[in-house]
Amino acid sequence: MVAERTFLAIKPDGVQRGLVGEILSRFERKGFKLIALKQLIPSRALAEQHYGVHRERPFFKGLVDFITSGPVIAMIWEGEGVILGARKLIGSTKPLDADPGTIRGDLAIDIGRNVIHGSDGPETASFEIGLWFESSELSDWNPSDQLWRVE
């Protein structure tokens, strides 16, 4: 059985501010498994597909401009309950509403510069994983401490 997977992306503000290591470590400490990671500057076409659900909203162009403005760290994480678990680690979309201890609660203050993106459900995760990664880019491996993380 394949464990649940989710797509996460550290946005250009998180990369530029040197937050990549801290953000990665939060997911590792939680016990989720990183199965794919790459750094890229997304093309406009990729960004427009990724944010396609917002195409008719007034902030769409700004969102696409921002996500294509610099490097992004695109990742796939795997584990039991990883989609909901990642959303809880990330915190509210609006950083000022995010709880202390969450990534956005601790590291962001503006909704337009909220450091990280995370898939909001299984269908979205599947779509985003397929959009950002080829299947050949995923690593299937078992951490040596796996028996100590889940029953």
UniProtKB/Swiss-Prot annotation:
Name the source organism: Prochlorococcus marinus (strain MIT 9211)
What highest taxon heads this organism's lineage? Bacteria
Q: Which residues form a coiled coil?
A: none
Q: Which gene encodes it?
A: ndk
Transferase as a keyword? yes
Q: Which family does it belong to?
A: Belongs to the NDK family.
* Name recorded for this polypeptide: Nucleoside diphosphate kinase
Q: Which cofactor does it need?
A: Mg(2+)
* Role of this protein: Major role in the synthesis of nucleoside triphosphates other than ATP. The ATP gamma phosphate is transferred to the NDP beta phosphate via a ping-pong mechanism, using a phosphorylated active-site intermediate.
Which residues span the membrane? Answer: none
